[in-house]
Amino acid sequence: MTTMSRRYTPNIIITGTPGCGKSSHSSSLVSQLNQTLGKETTIHFKHFNISEIAKERDCIESYDAKLDTSIVDEDKLLDSLEPDLEKGGVVVDWHCCDIFPERLIDLVVVLRTDNSNLFDRLKTRNYNDLKLQENLDCEIMEVILQEAKDSYIPDIVIELRSDTAEEMDENVDRISSWVETWIEDHPDGVSNELNKQYNPDDSSDEGDDNSDSDEYELEEDEQEEEEEREEYDEETNEEMEHTEDIAQ
C-alpha cells in the first residue's frame, strides 16, 4: 500500500468576525498546549495569524481603500500554507475559513460576540463607519458561522461565546482537552489525502500482453482504495465524537 503523508497533531481554525477574540484565543491556546504537551514530547503547536502571514509571504493582492483593508490572494496563500498544514499542529487565526481544504482541518471554532461588545472593540481599533457596520452586520447575520457549516462537516464546527475573559479561559481549556484526546486517539496520525477513485479514462491501452498485469494492478488498487475509505470513515467518526464532547 502506498505510504500517504500523515499528520500527528490536529489543525484547528479559530474564526469569527473581527473583534471577537480570535488572536487572543489562538495565542492563549498555543501557549497552553505547548506548556502541557511540549514538556514530555516533541509536540509543538504554531499560531498562524493569517493577516500577518499573508504580508510576510507576499500574498497581498490589492488594497480596498473604502474598507481600509488588504485583499489577500487566497490561492497563493493556500499554496504557501499547505506544507505547514500537512505537518499538523497549526492553529489558524482568521476571519475567513472556507479556503482551507477539509482534509487538512480537524476542528473549526467559530467565536461569537454580543454586538454591543463587538461595537466597542471595533471602535477602539478606529474602524471607519463603513467597515464597522459591515462587521456588525456580518455578526448579526451569522455569516461566518454559516460559511463554516457550508465548508466543513457540520460535526467538526463548534460555536463558542467570547464576551468575557472568563469565557475565553473556559474555551481554551475545552479546546486543549479536545486536542489531548485527539492525540491519544490517533497514535498513528491521520491521512492528509482524500480517497482517490480509479478513473478508467486515465489509463492507456498498452496492448494485450499487459492485460493480466493490468487486471491484477486494478484489483490491488481497489483493495487499497477500500482500505483507505475504511480508514477515512473511521477517522471521521472519531472526529465527530470528539467534537460532540467539546461542544457540550
UniProtKB/Swiss-Prot annotation:
Residues 49-72 are annotated as: NMPbind. The keyword Nucleotide-binding applies. It catalyses: AMP + ATP = 2 ADP; ATP + H2O = ADP + phosphate + H(+). Residues 239-248 have a biased composition (Basic and acidic residues). The keyword Plastid does not apply. Broad-specificity nucleoside monophosphate (NMP) kinase that catalyzes the reversible transfer of the terminal phosphate group between nucleoside triphosphates and monophosphates. Also has ATPase activity. Involved in the late cytoplasmic maturation steps of the 40S ribosomal particles, specifically 18S rRNA maturation. While NMP activity is not required for ribosome maturation, ATPase activity is. Associates transiently with small ribosomal subunit protein uS11. ATP hydrolysis breaks the interaction with uS11. This is Adenylate kinase isoenzyme 6 homolog HBR1.
